[in-house]
């Protein structure tokens, strides 16, 4: 014989219990492949700056 939970008790949430002890740390992961340093060339930098300035001027912003 199974008993049904009354409707008014179905959505009641009880407070959380105390936190358990911290577990042991896991093993250290493998080091990934070393990539490029992430810095572009001076030509790439100048291209980005000129594009940014063009966008600022076309939108009415910027100080140049």
Swiss-Prot record:
Superkingdom of the source species: Viruses
Keyword list, A-Z: Capsid decoration protein, Capsid protein, Virion
Residue stretches spanning the membrane: none
Intracellular or extracellular location(s): Virion
Major place of residence: virion
Residue span of region Disordered: 1-40
An annotated GO cellular component: viral capsid, decoration
Positions with biased composition (Low complexity): 15-40
Entry function: Decoration protein that binds to each capsid protein hexamer after capsid expansion and forms spikes at the surface of the capsid. Each of the 60 hexamers has three copies of the decoration protein gp12 in its center.
Quaternary data: Interacts with the capsid protein gp13.
Protein name per its UniProtKB record: Decoration protein gp12
Gene that produces this protein: 12
